[in-house]
């Protein structure tokens, strides 16, 4: 795998040797011997996939919180609950392990911010949570951008907090930490903010970017495609200017992207020169670690390389033909979580999404997250 991989592995071992000293100082106030949050996003639809991933597959002993995704709502604040969403065994098994389960609401806010019906949404959520034994709410609004949006976000989080003082209340924010999130005002209402430090790669880029760099690589010819906050280090700095460390969770992806028409890291997609938006568009598609990438690591015509600055892997074709994959493995996941928890002293980490690490038998990335959060060796 080359000298870069060897250097990466050596650094992991050196770091792990130091972790026991720092972890010994941590006092566990969370389940499963953890003093840092490990939050897992879980989409109800994953139990219909092959292999299925549902309540029976979740390793509750490696988590502190679960965000249960799938419910939507409209401009009147009415909830839409899809068939198969309600899983009593999810909540009961999580609670038996001391793990909190939260409703993940958001994506598109469907005009709620201008309809005047936010109290209706809050009331409907409170009724649903009481009926099905949920512990709180995670808001995933992609993305508030205006002063009006910011004021609405503060109002909504305030109403959720008034609705139930015991809620675990959080929201998801892009790594740039823009003013639309109103962090100085909203922090009084939320337990923590989940920083979505991923998707620096994807069809919206013109170059073969890294999905989630731990540190920014200055060799990137197009840093504007994911700036500001284009790395874990950069995003942490932005959010630490507005929030205390314990109120921040750093995101880590269990998925990546395949670029089909480039051969190297940071290459320009040839088709970007004639696409309407100047991006790679349909020359890029996403894949999960467990099903799409794990079995190709140094196999099936692919070779793994490591960016020695960003500290994340990527794959290229052995024969030099087109094909570039940006993803995370257990080394980079461990490093990202360790850096976030123990160097920047954040409150924890979270991932999108639990099922994307699953290969039908094991979850390498979740195990790495848990061990790094504990301060254990890999």
Regions found by a protein language model. Name each.
Residues 1-17:
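Classical eukaryotic N-terminal signal peptides for Sec-dependent ER targeting/secretion
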Residues 2, 17-33:
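N-terminal signal peptide
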Residues 27-129, 209-211, 230, 273-279, ...:
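Glycan-recognition patch characteristic of GH18 chitinases/ENGases
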Residues 62, 204, 210-213, 247-342, ...:
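Glycan-binding loop/region signatures in secreted carbohydrate-active enzymes
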Residues 66, 103, 139, 193, ...:
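Conserved, mostly hydrophobic/aromatic
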Residues 76-85, 142-294:
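Substrate-binding surface in catalytic domains of secreted glycosidases
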Residues 90-101, 131-133, 162-166, 189, ...:
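A structural motif corresponding to the C-terminal end of an alpha-helix
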Residues 124-152, 199, 350:
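Active-site groove signature of glycoside hydrolases
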């Amino acid at each position: 795998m080359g000298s870069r991989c060897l250097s990466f592995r050596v650094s992991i071992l050196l770091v792990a040797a130091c972790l026991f000293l720092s972890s010994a100082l941590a006092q566990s106030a969370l389940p499963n011997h953890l003093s840092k949050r490990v939050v897992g996003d879980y989409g109800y639809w994953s139990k219909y996939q092959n292999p299925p991933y549902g309540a029976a597959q979740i390793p509750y002993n490696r988590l502190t919180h679960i965000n249960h995704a799938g419910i939507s709502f409209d401009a009147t604040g009415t909830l839409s609950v899809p068939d198969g969403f309600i899983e009593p065994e999810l909540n009961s098994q999580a609670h038996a392990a001391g793990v909190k389960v939260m409703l993940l609401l958001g994506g598109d806010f469907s005009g709620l911010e201008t309809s005047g019906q936010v109290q209706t949404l809050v009331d409907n959520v409170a009724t649903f949570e009481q009926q099905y034994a949920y512990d709180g709410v995670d808001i995933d609004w992609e993305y508030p951008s205006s002063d009006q949006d910011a004021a609405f976000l503060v109002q909504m989080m305030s109403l959720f907090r008034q609705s139930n003082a015991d809620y675990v209340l959080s929201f998801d924010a892009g790594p740039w930490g823009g003013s639309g999130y109103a962090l100085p005002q909203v922090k009084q209402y939320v337990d923590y903010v989940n920083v979505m430090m991923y998707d620096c790669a994807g069809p919206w880029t013109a170059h073969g970017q890294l999905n989630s760099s731990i540190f920014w690589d200055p060799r990137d010819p197009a840093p504007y495609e994911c700036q500001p906050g284009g790395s874990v280090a950069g995003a942490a700095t932005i959010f630490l200017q507005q929030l205390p460390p314990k109120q921040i969770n750093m995101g880590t992806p269990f998925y990546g992207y395949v670029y089909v028409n480039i051969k190297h890291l940071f290459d320009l997609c040839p088709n970007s020169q004639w696409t309407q938006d100047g991006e790679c568009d349909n020359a890029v598609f996403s894949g999960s670690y467990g099903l799409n990438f794990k079995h190709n690591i140094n196999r099936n015509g692919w070779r793994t390389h490591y960016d020695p600055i960003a500290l994340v892997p990527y794959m290229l074709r052995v024969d030099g033909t087109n094909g570039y994959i940006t993803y995370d493995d257990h080394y980079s996941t461990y490093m990202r979580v360790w850096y976030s928890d123990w160097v920047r002293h954040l409150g924890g980490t979270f991932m999108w999404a639990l099922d994307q690490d699953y290969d039908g038998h094991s979850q390498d990335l979740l195990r790495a997250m848990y061990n790094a959060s504990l301060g254990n060796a890999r």
